[in-house]
Amino acid sequence: MKKICLYFEIHQIIHLKRYRFFDIGRDHYYYDDYENERSINDIAECSYVPALQTLIQMCKDHPEFRVAFSLSGCGLEQLEFHAPQVVDLLQEINSTGQVEFLCEPYSHGLSSLANEESFAAEVKRMSDRIKELFGKRPKVFRNSSLIYNDEIGAQVAAMGFKGILTEGAKQVLGWKSPHYIYHCASDPRLKLLLRDINLSEDITERFTSHPLMADQWLDWIASTPEGENVINIFGELVTFGIFHPLQSGILEFLKAIPVLAKERGIGFALPSDLCAEKSVGAIEVPYNISWVDEERDTSCWLGNVMQREAFNKLYSVADRVRVCGDRRIQMDWDCLQASNNFRFMTTKPGYQYRGIYDSPYDAFTNYMNILGDFISRVNNLYGGADNEEIDGLITMIKNQGDELAAKDKEIERLRKKLEKYNPTEVTEKKSVAKKEPAAKKASTAKKSASKAAPASKATSEQTAPKSVAKTIETPKAKEVKKAAKKSPAKKTAAPKTAAKKK
């Protein structure tokens, strides 16, 4: 049975403000608040809200329907602040049980190409955030713009993810089809789900260029060769309402998919469901691929000298930022890492949207001014310490962290090993429990002896040493108690006899 795996990305560009050279060292706020609020409210109203409402209704009407999402941490922060109704809708669709949330880098940046530790820290933060919001830790990973290579695959597998989404690029697939499940060449534990470029971009890129009907699109899926049962349709949620206006009928197209798919015997699957299946083989990806531009590589972010200079300068302080505890520095770091900052600097033809910038050189100058101020703030946190000293401290912290992680793994291994011997542990606990009452009786006997000891202290000291006195005091204690009961009567009677004699 053929299955469609639908996935949509939710990310929001954070716009930087115009920042002059003379602002360095004086102004530490880098954001265009007006443009950020305006853009996210427009996108929420025109795209996110109607698209999510449609998907929620589709989940309710069609129990077999499935859809997956991923959110960037920076985009999520903007939504929570400016458009919380979108987060509410995401939680509502999550409650249907027909949705999966994937993990991606918190900043929607390029840390996977620069610094392994920073990349791992970002992924962990986003995984924790997804768990906090939606109650379930993600099992499948999706890198920024589907960036992938074999090294990234090995890192993601080491983090515990079962699968990763990436592009079905021609230079990687060759004669192979994206309609199968593959695995990472560096680590077979990680499954690869490859995007069907043509079927995905029929919706995301070309929907309004030519009339596309849902039945025609599903006929193309149904006509794929027998055995090619995995159809991965990946795109951005802003496809509905921003890339293509709602007046184009794109939401009606989306609504019709479950009904027409059922008629053709086509089902739906979540990424984690597909990753649980067996792969047909490995795919080797020695160089970077992504879902951007015709080249399907990283040239739109790192294709010219300006982009590489900004990229290298930003990640030159990655280790310092990671170990610092300044929350404001961390927030600015997330925003400055966002991939759109580098994409605004591209000199490739055909890319026209640059935000507030007039040219790629304008974008580079503004970004480097902000980066200069940011790096000086980071360096000030370390009191002018040189790079060698800081690198030594960072290495020491990393080694200690690795040692702790190794100990945690060893503890977990031993704990699981002990669980196999539960029956013996239970019998040992029972035997210990039987011995405990006898111990309690001995302790109570000692307490009673210690209470009686003061009454016979004088006699015991005269007759026996202290060590022997503890054993012989207890029989005499009863006699002392009996004498103590009779002695008050004798004492009261003594004055009366004395008075009679007088």
Residue ranges with predicted function:
Residues 2-46, 180-181, 186-190, 208-209, ...:
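Active-site and substrate-binding clefts of carbohydrate-active enzymes
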Residues 3-8, 14-115, 139-142, 162-167, ...:
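Short, well-structured secondary-structure segments
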Residues 52-56, 87-91, 120-127, 153, ...:
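Generic structural signal for well-ordered alpha-helices
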Residues 92-95, 150-165, 183-186, 249-263:
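Short, surface-exposed basic-aromatic patches at helix termini and helix-loop junctions that form
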Residues 117, 132, 136-137, 142-180:
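Gly/Pro-rich turn-and-neighbor structural signature
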Residues 118-147, 219-234:
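CE4/NodB-like, metal-dependent polysaccharide N-deacetylase domain
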Residues 174-222:
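Alpha-amylase-like alpha-glycosidases and glucanotransferases acting on alpha-linked glucans and related
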Residues 420-502:
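Intrinsically disordered, polybasic Lys/Arg-rich low-complexity tracts
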